[in-house]
Amino acid sequence: MWPFPSDK
């Protein structure tokens, strides 16, 4: 999920 780096 952007703009979050933890899109895993």
Swiss-Prot record:
The record's remark on the cofactor is: Binds 3 Ca(2+) ions per subunit.
> Which cofactors are reported in the record for this sequence?
Ca(2+)
Provide the alphabetized UniProt keywords. Answer: Calcium, Carbohydrate metabolism, Glycosidase, Hydrolase, Metal-binding
- Record-level Gene Ontology MF annotations: alpha-amylase activity; metal ion binding
- Per the record, the domain of life is Eukaryota
The EC number on file is: 3.2.1.1
**Catalysed conversion reaction:** Endohydrolysis of (1->4)-alpha-D-glucosidic linkages in polysaccharides containing three or more (1->4)-alpha-linked D-glucose units
How does this polypeptide assemble, per the annotation? Answer: Monomer.
Give the UniProt family note: Belongs to the glycosyl hydrolase 13 family.
Q: What protein am I looking at?
A: Alpha-amylase 2
